[in-house]
């Protein structure tokens, strides 16, 4: 079996198990192409092939780690069908430096949305309509950027005040409540941006391209808004995903200030944000503690057991 077919077989098995496997598939296709260019024969995956692919380019340590994990799955699959395959190390040779997510301050959020809201209208682009609503969905509902860009018109129920998330990171959909203010924003946006719904079924779409907005475009626009708002952009700094972080931290701040039992409310936040377990949600407690120590200190005595301590890798 040629290596590209082996990759296809693995991808099919992961899809059958309910996994998206998109990023991993892209990595493994790149690895198969690397092996083809280097002339490695089918039937085996050598140490030379694996390490040349993983460590032969100047990649970020997090990217190397991601590629290692993808290749380990391919190697396991290859060994299962009788190939002689080298298993890459379980931990990257490059030290991973954890970069904590950036949380925008209240003032930065205010400046950012003021900038987004006052973009000039254009006959060539609908971004002045799209972006105020799109970025408010990220900040006001805590969606991942992929979830927001995959929203379709029927997924928004302004009268009920809900959003239906079809295409989630973990492959499981969910329906979430939204505030009346966000529901009204989306209702007004839909009326203005979709006067003829048949133009596009996607909630956020590019009028010029006639298709859904992609993540690269969203990121490029976000960087422009940061610059206009006087918010520095740097590695590990503000990113569209920072708005999702901001949603989580804002809710935790509100709950802590109100004396809520964090052990009770964390599962609700995890479900709302589409986390498969509490680990990701608990991490937002750490962010809240770091960014707003005066707020989180109120809960430390009663709920300190649910606030995770950074691991050595995170420190």
PLM regions: where:
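Conserved catalytic core of the tyrosine transesterase superfamily
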Residues: 1-315
């Amino acid at each position: 079996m040629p290596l590209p077919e082996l990759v296809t077989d693995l991808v099919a098995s992961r899809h059958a198990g309910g996994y998206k496997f998109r990023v991993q598939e892209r990595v493994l296709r790149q690895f198969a192409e690397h092996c083809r260019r280097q002339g490695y024969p089918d039937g085996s995956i050598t140490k030379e092939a694996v390490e040349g692919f993983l460590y032969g380019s100047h990649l970020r340590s997090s990217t190397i780690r991601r590629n290692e994990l993808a290749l380990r799955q391919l190697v396991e699959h290859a060994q299962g069908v009788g190939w002689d395959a080298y298993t890459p190390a379980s931990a990257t040779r490059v030290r991973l430096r954890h970069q904590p997510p950036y949380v925008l301050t209240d003032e930065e959020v205010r400046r950012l949305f003021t900038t987004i809201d006052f973009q000039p209208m254009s006959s060539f682009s609908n971004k002045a309509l799209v972006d105020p609503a799109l970025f408010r969905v990220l900040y006001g509902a805590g969606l991942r950027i992929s979830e927001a860009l995959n929203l379709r018109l029927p997924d928004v129920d302004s009268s009920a005040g809900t959003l239906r998330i079809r295409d989630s990171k973990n492959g499981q959909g969910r329906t979430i409540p939204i505030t009346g203010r966000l529901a009204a924003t989306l209702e007004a946006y839909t009326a203005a941006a979709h006067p003829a719904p048949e133009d596009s079924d996607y909630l956020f779409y590019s009028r010029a391209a006639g298709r859904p907005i992609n993540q690269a475009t969203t990121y490029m626009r976000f960087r422009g808004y940061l610059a206009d708002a006087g918010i520095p952009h740097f590695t590990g700094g503000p990113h569209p995903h920072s708005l999702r972080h901001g949603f989580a931290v804002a809710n935790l701040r509100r709950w802590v200030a109100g004396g809520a039992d964090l052990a009770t409310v964390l599962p609700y936040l995890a479900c709302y944000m589409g986390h498969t377990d509490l680990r990701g949600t608990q991490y937002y407690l750490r962010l809240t503690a770091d960014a707003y120590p005066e707020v989180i200190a109120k809960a430390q005595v009663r709920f300190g057991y649910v606030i995770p301590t950074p691991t050595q890798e995170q420190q």
